[in-house]
């Protein structure tokens, strides 16, 4: 299971592919074999294959209002 990049703040917002934002308290699981990405309960987690300062991406402000 691979998660999308999440915000560095404690907001627990994860940005799925296609700009799908999982709400607070949820994380995104990338779909495989043509399945769509899913938001499931759980704190957001950065992609496990990279552990750099650049792991995090800002959530567009329109999603934070």
UniProtKB/Swiss-Prot annotation:
Pfam family for this entry, one: Hirudin
Keywords linked to the UniProt accession: Disulfide bond, Glycoprotein, Protease inhibitor, Secreted, Serine protease inhibitor, Sulfation
Glycosylation, residue list: 45
Region Disordered, annotated ranges: 39-65
Residues that bear Sulfotyrosine: 63
Domain of life: Eukaryota
Region (Interaction with fibrinogen-binding exosite of thrombin) location: 55-65
Molecular function terms, GO-annotated: serine-type endopeptidase inhibitor activity
Disulphide bond pairs: 6-14, 16-28, 22-39
Compositional bias ranges of the Acidic residues kind: 55-65
Places the protein is found: Secreted
Span list, region Interaction with thrombin active site: 1-3
Reported function: Hirudin is a potent thrombin-specific protease inhibitor. It forms a stable non-covalent complex with alpha-thrombin, thereby abolishing its ability to cleave fibrinogen.
Assigned protein family: Belongs to the protease inhibitor I14 (hirudin) family.
Protein name as it appears in the record: Hirudin-3
């Amino acid at each position: 299971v691979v998660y999308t990049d999440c915000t560095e703040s404690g907001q627990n917002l994860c940005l799925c592919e296609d700009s799908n934002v999982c709400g607070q308290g949820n994380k995104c699981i990338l779909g495989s074999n043509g399945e769509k990405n899913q938001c499931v309960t759980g704190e957001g987690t950065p992609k496990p294959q990279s552990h750099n300062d650049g792991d995090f991406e800002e959530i567009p402000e329109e999603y934070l209002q």
